[in-house]
């Protein structure tokens, strides 16, 4: 019988195993909302405790080791010590969410609602500056607040958009070493998210961890810049890639092959129906920087490189392969053109599909348990053939998903 780590490594090598490997909770794009995590713990009869939030922005809950055992999860995640709001994730306190759930969040985060029912979030927890994000009344996650200053084209400086991307410190290296050693000891495949390596991810563009963000911080302006200000973005990506490679060199020296997979970038290139940029813009603006980063990883480490991109991305998949990505996620099977069979036939020898196991827009929240079982078994039959598949949902499991539907999904996996 394969170990969890062996199972994932075999999938990444496009080899079969004793069963399809499973990930829930190893990254910020393969997680589970804290409401569902609490419901799963209750279902499995695990001890009650406030769910620890591992991604504050999306309110994802920790899939602790006892829950991972119950769910049959083969992966474990390792992240940094600060969240997207520059809050200290090593220093937590108990708070009650607007929907009445007790959770553990960074001490700088106060979940108290204002008179309209909104919860405001501040960069570094500093209320001397305007809020950088908000959880609107009735919402189960947090949204960015754009603080774009007037843009003077003559004074645009790429360094302003690099303020949050820095060389890794000795303290951070020590923290990663401790976390990776603990994660590796579980026998699960270690998936690391070191941060600072996502090129042009609009989740980071607003600078929610900065008190006074400068540069281009409007998502609309950023997308327009992919056409209007390409040299500006090139310079950002060049310098960011320099920083990333220097950090990876230090991380490899400390962590080595105890890490199996690195999530380098979560930039979305697809919408439900199309792409956010043309193939030509992708090849000109992103591909050379991705390739330089990934080439370094492949030449100097044993790590496999994980790329997240939502949406209808078939036209750019060849570019992602050329750029050296090993893994694609979330495999949005209900987006235009993203047929599972076609993806496996055309791209399955080059990419490992990490996701696509169950549709999270319609099937998982609204299907019956029996419909979900059939759907999951069908996806596993298609994507799991000859390896190259790690089961996960299409992006994170959201707050409104009935726990019995998640159990139906997991029970179906046990029969594959």
Where are these regions (language model features)?
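Segments that shape or occlude catalytic/ligand-binding pockets
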Residues: 36-37, 41-86
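Acidic/aromatic-lined carbohydrate-recognition and catalytic surfaces
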Residues: 66-117
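Short, conserved acidic/polar surface loops in the N-terminal third of protein domains
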Residues: 80, 87-90, 123-124, 201-205
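A gly/proline- and charged-residue-enriched helix-loop-helix capping module
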Residues: 96-175
């Amino acid at each position: 019988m394969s170990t969890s780590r062996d199972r994932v490594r075999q999938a990444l090598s496009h080899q079969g195993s004793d069963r399809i490997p499973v990930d829930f909770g190893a990254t910020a794009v393969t997680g589970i909302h804290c409401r569902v995590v609490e419901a799963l713990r209750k279902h499995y009869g695990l001890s009650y405790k406030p769910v620890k939030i591992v991604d504050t922005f999306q309110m994802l809950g920790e899939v602790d080791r006892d829950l991972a055992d119950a769910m049959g999860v083969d992966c474990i995640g390792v992240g940094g010590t600060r969240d997207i709001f520059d809050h200290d994730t090593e220093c937590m306190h108990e708070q009650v969410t607007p929907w009445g759930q007790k959770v553990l969040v960074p001490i700088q985060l106060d979940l108290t609602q204002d008179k309209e029912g909104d919860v405001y979030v501040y960069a570094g927890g500093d209320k001397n500056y305007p809020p950088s994000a908000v959880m609107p009344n009735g919402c189960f996650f947090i949204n960015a607040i754009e603080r774009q200053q007037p843009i003077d084209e003559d004074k645009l400086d790429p360094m302003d958009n690099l303020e949050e991307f820095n060389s890794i410190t000795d303290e951070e290296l020590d923290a990663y070493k401790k976390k990776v050693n603990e994660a590796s000891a579980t026998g699960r495949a270690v998936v690391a998210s070191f941060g600072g390596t996502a090129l042009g991810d609009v989740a980071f563009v607003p600078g929610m961890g900065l008190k006074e963000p400068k540069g281009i911080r409007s998502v609309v302006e950023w997308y327009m810049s992919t056409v209007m200000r390409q040299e500006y973005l090139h310079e950002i990506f060049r310098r960011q890639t320099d920083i990333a490679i220097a950090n990876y060199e230090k991380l490899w020296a400390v962590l080595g092959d105890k890490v199996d997979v690195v999530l380098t970038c979560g930039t979305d290139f697809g919408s439900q129906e199309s792409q956010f940029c043309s193939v030509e813009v992708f090849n000109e603006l992103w591909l050379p920087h991705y390739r330089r980063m990934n080439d370094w990883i492949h030449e100097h480490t044993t790590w496999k490189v994980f790329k997240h991109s939502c949406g209808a991305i078939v036209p750019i998949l060849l570019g992602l392969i050329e750029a050296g990505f090993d893994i694609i996620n979330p495999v949005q099977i209900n987006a235009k053109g993203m047929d599972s069979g076609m993806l496996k036939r055309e791209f399955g020898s080059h990419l490992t599909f990490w996701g696509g196991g169950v549709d999270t827009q319609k099937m998982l929240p609204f299907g019956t348990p029996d419909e979900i079982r059939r759907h999951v078994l069908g996806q596993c039959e298609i994507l799991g053939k000859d390896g190259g598949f790690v089961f996960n949902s299409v992006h994170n499991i959201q707050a409104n998903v009935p726990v019995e539907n998640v159990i139906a999904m997991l029970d179906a996996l046990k029969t594959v």
